[in-house]
């Protein structure tokens, strides 16, 4: 069993705070990409709001802003199910990774009305991420 690194832990803690649910390491099996899409868009939206989850660069993808570096990180998380479970069960360690980020994440969640769209969160964050990316890179 290999331990999670700093960026993996920060991503997992931010995911739970942003979406109100835990990252699912099995979501990508059988070609389902929703967990990765949600996390890609969440990290991009947080970065645009001044909350840096990792040092990721984004470019346009057919599903909106995409970071190859973040995909590598997410795939490494997917292979560490036991470590992910252990991290989520350790409230003290989770809190350490959210220090100074909670209020910013909560404020963004509220502004983006994440709770209203939990049933369609993948599509909602895709739309929000895409609009944000286009408004910052394409439109004057």
Where would I find each of the regions flagged by the language model?
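Domain-edge interaction signal
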Residues: 1-140
């Amino acid at each position: 069993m290999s331990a999670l690194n700093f960026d993996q832990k920060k991503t997992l803690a931010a995911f739970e705070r942003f979406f109100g649910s835990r990252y699912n390491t099995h979501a990508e099996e059988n070609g389902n990409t929703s967990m990765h899409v949600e996390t890609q868009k969440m990290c991009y939206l947080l970065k645009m709001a001044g909350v840096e989850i990792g040092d990721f660069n984004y470019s346009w993808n057919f599903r909106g802003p995409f970071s190859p570096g973040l995909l590598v990180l997410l795939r490494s998380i997917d292979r560490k199910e036991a470590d992910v479970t252990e991290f989520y069960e350790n409230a003290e360690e989770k809190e350490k990774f959210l220090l100074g980020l909670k209020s910013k994440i909560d404020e963004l969640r509220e502004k983006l009305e994440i709770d209203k769209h939990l049933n369609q969160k993948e599509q909602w964050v895709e739309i929000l991420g895409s609009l944000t990316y286009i408004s910052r890179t394409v439109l004057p």
